[in-house]
Amino acid sequence: MARNKPLGRKLRLARALKSNRAIPVWVVIRTSRRIRFNLLRRHWRRSKLKV
């Protein structure tokens, strides 16, 4: 990908980067383990973003 990105694309990539993480431990505790993992986790090589 180009080094010089439009601002909109850069913001979308930043949002995807922040949302691509495990859920906090306190969420697992608070929901009594009903929510254990993030279903929307994305691996950089397996699935690509539609940006």
Swiss-Prot record:
Pfam family, one: Ribosomal_L39
Protein origin, superkingdom: Archaea
InterPro entries recorded: Ribosomal_eL39, Ribosomal_eL39_CS, Ribosomal_eL39_dom_sf
GO molecular function: structural constituent of ribosome
GO cellular component: ribonucleoprotein complex; ribosome
Keyword annotations of the record: Ribonucleoprotein, Ribosomal protein
Annotated disulfide bonds: none
Keyword Ribosomal protein: yes
BP GO terms, sorted: translation
Residue intervals passing through the bilayer: none
Sequence similarity: Belongs to the eukaryotic ribosomal protein eL39 family.
NCBIfam families: PRK01242.1
Name of the protein in question: Large ribosomal subunit protein eL39
Organism field: Aeropyrum pernix (strain ATCC 700893 / DSM 11879 / JCM 9820 / NBRC 100138 / K1)
